[in-house]
Design a protein with these regions (language model features):
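Extracytoplasmic small-molecule ligand-binding "clamshell" domains
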Residues: 29, 33-37, 43-68, 84, ...
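Extracytoplasmic/secreted envelope proteins and their assembly/folding machinery
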Residues: 24-31, 56-59, 107, 159-162, ...
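Contiguous mixed-secondary-structure segments that line small-molecule binding/active-site clefts
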Residues: 32, 63, 68, 73-170
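Sec/Tat signal peptide C-region and signal peptidase I cleavage site
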Residues: 2-8
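Short helix-initiation/N-cap motifs at beta->coil->alpha
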Residues: 47-60, 153-157, 169-183
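Short, intrinsically disordered, charge-balanced linker/junction segments flanking boundaries
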Residues: 184-188
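Nucleotide donor/acceptor-binding cores
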Residues: 9-11, 147
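Extracytoplasmic "Venus flytrap"
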Residues: 12-29, 49-54
Length: 188
């Protein structure tokens, strides 16, 4: 006879990803698979769209046990494993095929590095390629230097890239980007 706990566990998981987004749909599908495989002894309560606060607030809530999980951008995870920024190096990849190949070689090492830093990783999701978007034409670096350029808060790689071409980056959390655009704090 194999014994197991009949107690149910509900994992509370937060993310900035909006409800209805590809990422939330994927997380919900994965959660349903776990729920089915455990006969609903393990369930999930999702907190999308930043309702639990920004990424720093979510990490604090995880530390005190209010949340059991989160989907976080790599920049927020630097304190657990500094090499986590490897995939964010600008212009490193030329195609999604190249990304897939490199990920097949490095994901396990990243997951192990996070575990050593105290963070259990259930998966790594791609965010796609990053682009500068602005209402003003940008033809040369001097044009970009005149813009108010947003970079994700704690994204060291993006901030250093901006600085390397003479741009003073404005780091903001994702929920602060739309208000920043509306008020003119950032425009790129």
């Amino acid at each position: 006879m194999v014994g197991y706990s009949s107690h149910a566990a509900t994992f509370k998981v937060a993310t900035l990803s909006p409800d209805g987004s590809f990422w939330m749909k994927t997380m919900r599908e994965a959660g349903k698979e776990v729920e089915a495989a455990t006969d609903n002894r393990v369930t999930f309560k999702w907190y999308p769209g930043g309702v639990m606060g920004d990424d720093k607030a979510v990490l604090r809530k995880m530390r005190v046990g209010q949340l059991q999980g989160a989907a976080l951008p790599m920049g927020e995870l630097l304190s657990f494993f500094p090499d986590s920024q490897a995939y964010g190096i600008p212009f490193l990849f030329n195609s999604y095929e190249e990304v897939d190949y490199v990920r097949s070689q490095l994901d396990d090492a990243l997951i192990a590095g996070f575990a050593e830093g105290g963070m259990e990783v259930l998966g790594i999701a791609e965010g796609g390629f990053g682009y500068f978007l602005t209402a003003e034409p940008v033809r040369v670096p001097a044009d970009l230097q005149q813009q108010r350029v947003w970079v994700p808060q704690n994204d060291v790689v993006s901030a250093r890239l901006a600085q390397s071409i003479g741009v003073t980056p404005i780091p903001l959390t994702l929920p602060d980007v739309l208000p920043g655009l509306q008020t003119g704090l950032v425009n790129t």
